[in-house]
């Protein structure tokens, strides 16, 4: 996984942002 992150940092960053956004969305909908 670390090798893929080094070779494609933009892909890893995008996946991280999407994962974080999904977690926040689920938490937000869960609180509501």
Curated annotation (Swiss-Prot):
Q: Active-site positions, per UniProt?
A: 5
Q: Write out the entry's keywords from A to Z.
A: Fibrinogenolytic toxin, Fibrinolytic toxin, Hemostasis impairing toxin, Hydrolase, Protease, Serine protease, Toxin
- Please provide the Gene Ontology terms (biological process) for this protein: proteolysis
Quote the temperature dependence note.
Optimum temperature is 60 degrees Celsius. Active from 30 to 70 degrees Celsius.
Provide the E.C. number(s) assigned to this enzyme. 3.4.21.-
Q: What does this protein do?
A: Serine protease. Has fibrinolytic and fibrinogenolytic but no plasminogenolytic activity. Cleaves after Arg and Lys residues. Cleaves fibrinogen alpha chain, beta chain and gamma chain in that order.
- Further comment found in the protein's record: On the 2D-gel the determined pI of this protein is: 4.55, its MW is: 31 kDa.
Q: Name the protein family.
A: Belongs to the peptidase S8 family.
Its recorded name reads Fibrinolytic enzyme 2
Source organism: Hediste japonica (Polychaete worm)
């Amino acid at each position: 996984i670390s090798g893929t992150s080094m070779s494609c940092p933009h892909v890893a960053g995008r996946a991280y942002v999407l994962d974080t956004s999904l977690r926040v969305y689920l938490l937000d909908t869960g609180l509501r």
